[in-house]
C-alpha cells in the first residue's frame, strides 16, 4: 500500500493534528528509522493516541506498521531514482540541476586540492625544484588530460628560460627519452602510473641516466617504482568519471607549485624573462 500517496490524496480531509503528522512524516521520511511515536508526539505537541489513530485512518494497524511501510517506500523510490538517473561524472547525475552540478564540481575540486596539499613533503619538493633548476634539458610526458597539464607546465618553464619539450605523440616521447643524458630530467605525469607509453619512456630515461620525477597517485604502480622522486596527487573521482576533472586540478596544483618554486629560486632573472615574454605577445595583438 502506497502510504505516501494516500497521505497526499487525503490532505483535504485531515484535522489540524493529522496535518501536523502528515507534514512531519513527509519531511522526515528518510529519518523514520530513528523515530518513535512517543518522540514524534512530544516534538509535535500531540498525544501518542493521535498518531496511532492517524495510522489506522490510512489503513495501517498502528504507527509501527505505517513507519516501516514508509521506510520501505522511500528506499524503493531512491533505488528507482538511482537506476534511472544517468551518472554523468562522479556523484553528478542527469537529474541534477546546474546549480547542484556547480556545487558538486566545486567541492570535488576543493577536496582534490586540500588532500593533495596535505600530502606534500615540502623538503622533498624543494629538492625536486633544485634538481629541475640544474637540468640542461627537461622532458615532460603525459597522455590525455595529463598531457594538457604537461603542456601547460612546459609553456611556463619555457617562459623562464628552461629548455623543455612536451610532445603529444607517444612515439616522439619515446624517441626524446632515449636521447636524454645524465643530469637531464623527465617529468612523467600519470595519475594511474600504469600507462605503458609513460612507463616505457620512464624506463628509457632512467637507463640513459636522467632523473625521473613522477606526478602520480599514491597507488603503487610501475611509474612510482621507476621514479627517483614522486609528487603525490589525490583525486576523489569515482568509477563514474566522464573526464579527469579533479585529477587535473590536483596535478595543476603540483605543477603550478613547481613553477612558482623555480621562479622564486631565480626571482630577478625569471621575472625579467616573464616580462619580456609578455611584451612580445603584446606586439602580436
Curated annotation (Swiss-Prot):
Domain HTH rpiR-type stretches: 1-77
Keywords from the UniProt entry: Carbohydrate metabolism, DNA-binding, Repressor, Transcription, Transcription regulation
SUPFAM superfamilies to which the protein is assigned, alphabetical: Homeodomain-like, SIS domain
GO molecular-function term, one example from the UniProt record: DNA binding
Listed Pfam families: HTH_6, SIS
Domain SIS: 128-268
Ranges annotated as DNA-binding: 37-56
Quaternary organization: Homotetramer.
HAMAP family: HTH_type_MurR
Name the record gives this protein: HTH-type transcriptional regulator MurR
Organism, as annotated: Escherichia coli O7:K1 (strain IAI39 / ExPEC)
Amino acid at each position: 500500500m502506497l502510504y505516501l500517496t494516500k497521505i497526499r490524496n487525503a490532505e483535504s480531509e485531515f484535522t489540524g493534528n493529522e496535518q501536523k503528522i502528515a507534514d512531519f512524516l513527509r519531511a522526515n521520511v528518510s529519518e523514520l528509522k530513528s523515530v518513535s511515536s512517543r518522540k514524534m508526539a512530544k516534538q509535535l505537541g500531540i498525544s501518542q493516541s493521535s498518531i496511532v489513530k492517524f495510522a489506522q485512518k490510512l489503513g495501517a494497524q498502528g504507527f509501527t506498521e505505517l513507519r516501516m511501510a514508509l521506510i520501505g517506500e522511500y528506499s524503493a523510490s531512491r533505488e528507482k531514482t538511482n537506476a534511472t538517473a544517468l551518472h554523468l561524472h562522479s556523484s553528478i547525475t542527469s537529474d541534477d540541476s546546474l546549480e547542484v552540478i556547480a556545487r558538486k564540481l566545486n567541492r570535488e575540486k576543493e577536496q582534490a586540492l586540500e588532500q593533495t596539499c596535505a600530502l606534500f613533503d615540502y623538503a622533498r619538493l624543494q629538492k625536486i625544484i633544485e634538481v629541475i633548476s640544474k637540468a640542461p634539458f627537461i622532458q615532460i610526458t603525459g597522455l590525455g588530460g595529463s598531457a594538457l597539464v604537461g603542456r601547460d607546465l612546459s609553456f611556463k618553464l619555457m617562459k623562464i628560460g628552461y629548455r623543455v619539450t612536451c610532445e603529444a605523440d607517444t612515439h616522439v616521447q619515446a624517441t626524446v627519452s632515449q636521447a636524454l643524458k645524465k643530469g637531464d630530467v623527465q617529468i612523467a605525469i600519470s595519475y594511474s602510473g600504469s600507462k605503458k607509453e609513460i612507463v616505457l619512456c620512464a624506463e628509457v630515461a632512467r637507463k640513459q641516466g636522467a632523473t625521473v620525477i613522477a606526478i602520480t597517485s599514491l597507488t603503487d604502480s610501475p611509474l612510482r617504482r621507476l621514479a627517483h622522486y614522486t609528487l603525490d596527487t589525490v583525486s576523489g573521482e569515482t568509477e563514474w568519471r566522464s573526464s579527469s576533472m579533479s585529477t587535473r586540478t590536483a596535478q595543476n596544483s603540483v605543477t603550478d607549485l613547481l613553477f612558482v618554486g623555480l621562479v622564486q629560486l631565480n626571482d630577478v632573472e625569471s621575472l625579467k624573462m616573464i616580462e619580456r615574454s609578455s611584451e612580445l605577445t603584446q606586439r602580436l595583438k
